[in-house]
Amino acid sequence: MLLYRQTIEDFGLYAGAELSDAQMLALNTAASKMSAKMRAVRIVASSSVSKNDLEQRLIHKGETPMAAKEAVDWMSDMQLLDDRVTAEQIVHRCIAKGYGLARAKQALFEKRIPKEYWQDALADYPDQEDAIVQYLTAHRHDLAESRGMKRTIDALIRKGHSYHNIRRALEQMALDADDLLED
């Protein structure tokens, strides 16, 4: 059993100490809770996670559901875990990467952000037409042939841009993609 310093101090443990069955059970429970808390700290320090995502990751890593729930509550009480802030961070990263609205929603879903925070986080999502035009301009050499244009359009769709916005950007660039887009 791995014990953290705090647990050792809480139980007043020393080499050769004998514990009753009740004390051993309490020690195991405390060790499990502390393990979940420390693992939660490591996870939160390395990536943006929601409360649900953190709890599921802790359980997946071998923590008990009760210890995982208590660790998430502990992190929330210390204000180290906030789904609203996490949602805003995820949306900001999606905007920086040039993703469309659909891809941003997918990222929020993947991180298990509760839907009640989606609307606020996505409220200021900018129109992505400029990002689409920049992408099309950067891949202009691919647009000369129909196969290259289709690949470029498919890449934009994978980035979460809507068909309507891509078509508008193509029209803005004065490219006629009608034949290709109907495939």
Whereabouts are the PLM-identified features?
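An alpha-helical, amphipathic repeat domain used for nucleic-acid recognition
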Residues: 1-183
